């Protein structure tokens, strides 16, 4: 199992440079998709991720992260061990991070994005094996949801989490 980190970034803005520097500092092989392309919406982003996942070894562990507000705070050395233990203990094969806004921000985000099992998910970081992530993306994009320019990956992830507790866990 190889641990891979992937993001979709069309431009060098936000914290993208900080993400790249943190990846380099911690020895993370960060794959950047969409560089120099025109942003096509979240459905486009999810299709880019699907293309990448289809080319990965099915036993890889892939960390999908947002390009503009995520940084690495340490190497990914122990992520594979943690993930294997999580799945061996009966955990779902996709693990999503949570959003911890607190106060009125928590209420607002809950209204905008919804909740899964009472928790705000964060589509900025989720991981799994390529087959599990492809199943997630397929569920997220069901019924043409990814074809809309209004599609939002956080809402789509939350809806998939609600529908598929067997597929998505919350960390």
Protein language model regions, located:
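Short coil/turn segments at secondary-structure boundaries
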Residues: 17-21, 35, 76-78, 138-141
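A conserved donor-nucleotide-binding helix/loop in the catalytic core
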Residues: 38-65, 71-75, 118-121, 152-157
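Aromatic-acidic/polar surface patches that form glycan- and anion
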Residues: 12-15, 38, 42, 116-126, ...
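A generic structural motif
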Residues: 30-39, 95-100, 149-154, 171
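Catalytic core and acceptor-binding pocket of nucleotide-sugar-dependent glycosyltransferases
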Residues: 120-171
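Generic preference for well-ordered alpha-helical elements
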Residues: 13-16, 46, 69, 73-76, ...
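N-terminal anchoring/stem segment of glycosyltransferases
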Residues: 1-61, 89
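Conserved donor-nucleotide/metal-binding helix-loop-beta segment in metal-dependent transferases, i.e.
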Residues: 70-118
């Amino acid at each position: 199992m190889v641990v891979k980190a992937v993001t979709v970034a069309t431009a060098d803005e936000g914290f993208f440079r900080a993400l790249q520097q943190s990846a380099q500092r911690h020895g993370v092989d960060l794959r950047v998709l969409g560089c120099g392309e025109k942003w096509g919406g979240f459905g486009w982003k999810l299709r880019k991720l699907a293309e990448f996942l289809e080319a990965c070894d099915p036993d890889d562990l892939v960390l999908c992260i947002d390009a503009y507000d995520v940084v690495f705070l340490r190497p990914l050395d122990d992520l594979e061990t943690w993930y294997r233990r999580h799945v061996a203990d009966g955990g779902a094969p996709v693990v999503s991070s949570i959003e911890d806004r607190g106060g009125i921000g928590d209420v607002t985000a809950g209204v905008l994005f919804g909740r899964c099992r009472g928790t705000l998910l964060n589509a900025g970081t989720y991981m799994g094996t390529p087959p599990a992530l492809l199943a997630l993306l397929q569920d997220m994009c069901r019924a043409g949801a990814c074809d809309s320019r209004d599609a939002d990956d956080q809402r789509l992830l939350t809806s998939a989490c609600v529908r598929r507790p067997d597929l998505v866990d919350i960390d």
